[in-house]
Amino acid sequence: MIGAFSLCLNPLLFTMLTITTCKTYPSAPQNLILVQTQLSDQGIPTQFLPWQETLQSHFILPLAAWDYANFYDEFTQWIKQHKNAFINPAELMLWNSHKGYLCDLQNWGVNVIPTIICSTKTSEILTALESQDWPEFVIKPAVGQSGNLVTKLKQGEVLPDLSAYGEQVVLQPFIPEVATNGETSLIFFNGVFSHAIRRQPPQNEWRANSQYKVEIIPVEVDSHIIETACHVLHKLPEMPIYARVDGTIIHNQFLLNELELIEPALYLDRWEGATERFVDVLKSKILK
């Protein structure tokens, strides 16, 4: 029914699925162009458009909305405005857009890197740190993307200028294994494991984000690591259609660093069949 209905619409005014980019980075990444091509070839018209533009689309996939942290209020309002159109549940994405979700997962029994959320007031930050035995710690914005403004400090060091960090910050212990072991990302489609990669920081770098020239390595992971990551997803009130579970493997145990439910890089081009698996799960969502 949906496929037949779409043929009656002016393609210049309407499309079945919009994969949103952003005004800051409007170009579509190549691996998502392959998703667009496969979906369109299979009868699901798909376009790219910045999330800040007016959308006329049944479904929205915000996988390249890479600037939302800089326009957070507008972005969350946009999600609420189009809440019934998103591939992933809107309430899950709103929850996931602020790193306070890590505290929730911690409270739900997930093995999460210890996380404190507090205001940007120096006195509050120092009070929070006093009760922690962290020789080194990391401070980052509570709303942030791609490792921006992530800073490592030693106890007693002067805090950086926090004027660009927003209203709240995240405090976490520095985990040296991130630099040595890298960060392992497990990608799931509708709760089913698809593939995994490891982001390995270069020498003398400890951040595992792409802007820091990490090496992206496809990896096989042990079944118990997959089960641990899957367990994280089953803690959620709804199962996301797509999810990336990021963590560091320390002594063969998975320590959760991040759960990405909005605009994760899915590394579809790094594993044979990954694009096809993603397209299949999108089709099932759209055509059900």
Q: What kind of region is each of these model predictions?
A:
Residues 112, 171, 242-244, 256:
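Hydrophobic residues on conserved beta-strands that form the core of alpha/beta folds
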Residues 17-21, 78-83, 87, 91-181, ...:
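Active-site nucleotide/adenylate-binding loops and adjacent lid/helix of ATP-dependent enzymes
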Residues 22-119:
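Conserved N-proximal alpha/beta basic substrate-recognition cap immediately N-terminal to
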Residues 238-240, 249-288:
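C-terminal active-site "lid" helix and adjoining low-complexity regulatory extension at the edge
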Residues 148-233, 248, 255:
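Phosphate-binding site of ATP-dependent enzymes
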Residues 1-2:
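Short hydrophobic transmembrane-like helices used for membrane targeting/insertion
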